Amino acid sequence: MSEDEFFGGDNEAVWNGSRFSDSPEFQTLKEEVAAELFEINGQISTLQQFTATLKSFIDRGDVSAKVVERINKRSVAKIEEIGGLIKKVNTSVKKMDAIEEASLDKTQIIAREKLVRDVSYSFQEFQGIQRQFTQVMKQVNERAKESLEASEMANDAALLDEEQRQNSSKSTRIPGSQIVIERDPINNEEFAYQQNLIEQRDQEISNIERGITELNEVFKDLGSVVQQQGVLVDNIEANIYTTSDNTQLASDELRKAMRYQKRTSRWRVYLLIVLLVMLLFIFLIMKL
C-alpha cells in the first residue's frame, strides 16, 4: 500500500489545509467590531478613572466641591456614549453571526468566536463599572444631603438666635413694626443650588439603573451568540483533534507496514542467496 493511498479519503482535508474562503463581508464586519471594541474599552477605562477620583473625594469628605459635579457630568456622558457603542457593536456582532458557516474557513470561525467573547467581556465590565459609579454617586448624594441638612439646621438656629436677640432689645424696637428675618441671599442661592444638584443626581442614578436593565436584554442576545459560537468552535476543535488522532494512527500503521515490507524483502534476499548456494553446490557435485 502506498503512502498516497494510505493517507487519502477522510484525511485529505488535513494535508490540503483549510478550505479556501473569501468573505469580504466578514472581513469588513470584523474590522468594524474590532474598532468599536477598542473605542468601548478606552471609554470604560476613562469611566473607571472618573469613578476612582469620585471615591477619593468621598474619602476626603469633600463632596460639595465643584470638581465633583464636573466629573459626575462627564461620567454620565461617558456612560451614555458607551451604551450607544454597545448597541452599535451588538448590531455588528449579529450581522457577523448571520454569515453562513460554509462561507468561512476554520480560522475565520475561531476569530469570530474570539471577537464575540471579547465583546461579551467588555459588556460585563461596563455593567460592573456602571454599578460602581451609581454606588459612588449614591454615597456622594447621601453626604451632600447630610451636609445640606446640617447647614439648614445651622441657619435655622442662627435665625432663631437673631430673632430672640431682637425680641429682647425692646429699647431699639419700633412699636408696631414687624420683624422680617431672611436667610442671607448668597446662602439661599447656594442652598438651592446644592439641593438642585442632589435632585439631578438622583434622576441620573435612576436613568443609569434603568439603562443597565435595558442593556441586560442586549447581553442576553449576546450571550446566546457566545454560546452558539462556543459550541461551533468546540466542534471544530474536536474535529481537528479527531483528525489529528486519525492521522497519527495512520502514520503509525504506515510505519508498521513499511517495517514489515523491509523485513519481508530482507528474508527474500536471504532465501535467494541460500538457493544460489545450493544450486552452486549441486552443480559442483555433478561436475565431479
From Swiss-Prot:
Chief localization: membrane
Pfam families (UniProt xref): SNARE, Syntaxin_2
Gene Ontology biological process terms in this record: cytoplasm to vacuole targeting by the Cvt pathway; Golgi to endosome transport; Golgi to vacuole transport; Golgi vesicle fusion to target membrane; intracellular protein transport; macroautophagy; vacuole inheritance; vesicle docking
Top-level taxon of origin: Eukaryota
CDD domains per record: SNARE_Qa
Keyword list, A-Z: Coiled coil, Membrane, Phosphoprotein, Transmembrane, Transmembrane helix, Ubl conjugation
Domain t-SNARE coiled-coil homology: 195-257
GO MF, one example: SNAP receptor activity
Positions of transmembrane segments: 269-288
Modified residues (Phosphoserine): S2, S23
Membrane topology classification: Single-pass type IV membrane protein
UniProt cross-references to SUPFAM superfamilies, sorted A to Z: t-snare proteins
PROSITE patterns named among the record's database cross-references: SYNTAXIN, T_SNARE
Family: Belongs to the syntaxin family.
Biological function: Plays a role in the sorting and targeting of vacuolar proteases.
Protein name: Syntaxin PEP12
Gene field: PEP12
